[in-house]
Amino acid sequence: MIERLILFNFQSDKNTKHTRVRNMLLRRAAAALPARKTPLHCYRRLGGSYRALSGSLLLRDEEKRLPHRVQDERDEAKADTDLAADGDSAATKPWYLNIVERPAQNMPLHQQEIVFPANSPKSLETIATFLRDKLGLSDVLIFDLRDSQDEQVTAASKISDFMVMATAKSGRHGHKSFIELNTLLKQEFKTVGQVEGNISANELRRRQKRLARHTNLSKSMGSRTATTRSGSNLESWYMIDCRLDNIFVNILTENKRQDLNLEELYAPPDQKHLYRREAPAEDVAPKEGDDNVLAGLKRLAARNQRRYFTTVPARVQIIDALSRQDFDLVLNVVSASKMDSLDILKAANQTLRSMPYGVKIEGESWITFLDEVWPLAPYSQDFWSTRLELFKLLNCAAPGQVNVDRVFTGYLKFKLASGESLTKSDLVEFLQLVETNLSENSHVDYEDLVAKNKCVLEALKLYKGLDPRLILDSEVMCLLLSTLSITQSGSTSTLRAFYEMVEFASREFSQEPPVPVTATVLRILADKQDYARILRFWEKSIASSPEKDHRPWPLFLDTVASTGDQEFAKKVIRDGHLLWIKRNGVKASPELREAIERLFAVADPAEVAFKDVKEFLTVE
């Protein structure tokens, strides 16, 4: 029995030292058991003879066992030495401290590389590395919201500089992660973060009970939210304000991150398409050969799926589609959204202004789109100003498709046909557009000048029954005079209507012509080098009373001097045109003296021929 017990205790031990101890114990047990056997009851009566016999027998047994005993003593001494050595090593280092270092597992989690923004603080690197290496969060992304160029400004870009996104394996993992992150902030940076989305178990049960009391509300909200035993949601989202360098951390479960798609919201405008999700394909009707039961299950599963939605505003989608001139997509977005027509028109104007140089503009398609989104009854002037601006942009980007005639038809005639009254600003904007087309186009010729003036004449006819005196406005008259002439290769060409307008202006403003009208006439005649008409126009406006000569003399003298023609300047002096300054008592202002100096510098650079006249005019 003892031998079995010894073998049972040492059966799984492979240590050599322990094997010696086991063998020694077995030999001792085998030697001790025969010696301890009790003699029979019959031999006890023999007395001394028995003791002598037993002594002799024991002596013989001892002689036989003497070699074995010596070997046992040697084994015992060696076993004691081994046990003492084991005891010393165990005393210095306990067995539970012998921990084997496991090699680091080569998992994809440790291979993920985090891209940090330029000039990011050291704290951001510490937090992002802690999320990846210590907490085991995956798909760590960092968005730089400093100097965001996104047209759709969000609250996150106003209060944060860096937005960190990370994925947790479960709701409990996310719950534990934000606790560990808060601990890091306390220990390393001496700050305490603020978390949103951490709903306790009691609060969650309270909400579920509230929903259960209202049956209809509970049905509309769907099934109860799945929670773990610790009270954390299976699908959760924790947003932590680190209160450190404007860093915000979002910890989401995988399904929650896919549903919210926050990357599209925080990404720069040129990277939003990388995170944009496509709309799910529409269900295909089952064929006749399909199993109706399976088809019904498919439809039921599709109906119970979460509805697709996007975080991109409709305005941003419209601008993106218009920049690619995908008008079908724009109309689909417009029909699906509830944007106001005015906002859509402003988005179109903004897109045209930001179009890169060299992109071919489809002018007719833009006008068709404008007519599609135009409201039936515009109630404010903003609609018409936005429409006019759109036509002006199209004329600038595609003058071959949207010319002056197209603008006249699409805006002036369209507005009048819609029951709206034309205003002075409408005519001024149209005349400025015509003048720009004539002055900035280097390939315009006399025929183009005639064609554009026919369009101007049609525009004036629209105002004939509205405000006939509008043509006498100085701003309108200056623009009309500018549209009647063109300058090509240093030479100016004018229509006959220009001289008729000059005669009309001289007749209507015989007493005090407006200064802008006078300046426009003098400029065009000087460019044309029609000096005789310059003097004729200037003399027609001489007042009969000396006290009423309010003509812009500095302007007239500067016009003569700017021609650089010495003979023309001498003619003005010799013919006595400057003497009207003294005759009519025109005040010699500093501007007038400077104009006289410039004129005499052109006519008499040596100051010999007209020195007396110059002194007479400049002396008060």
Curated annotation (Swiss-Prot):
Gene3D superfamilies: Beta Polymerase, domain 2. SUPFAM superfamilies: Nucleotidyltransferase. Keywords: Membrane, Mitochondrion, Mitochondrion inner membrane, Transit peptide. The keyword Transit peptide applies. Residues 66-81 have a biased composition (Basic and acidic residues). The keyword Zinc-finger does not apply. One of its GO terms (cellular component) is mitochondrial inner membrane. It is found in: Mitochondrion inner membrane. Residues 66-85 are annotated as: Disordered. It is a peripheral membrane protein. GO terms for biological process: mitochondrial gene expression; mRNA stabilization. Probable mitochondrial mRNA stabilization factor. PANTHER family: ATPASE SYNTHESIS PROTEIN 25, MITOCHONDRIAL. Belongs to the ATP25 family. This is ATPase synthesis protein 25, mitochondrial. It comes from Lachancea thermotolerans (strain ATCC 56472 / CBS 6340 / NRRL Y-8284).
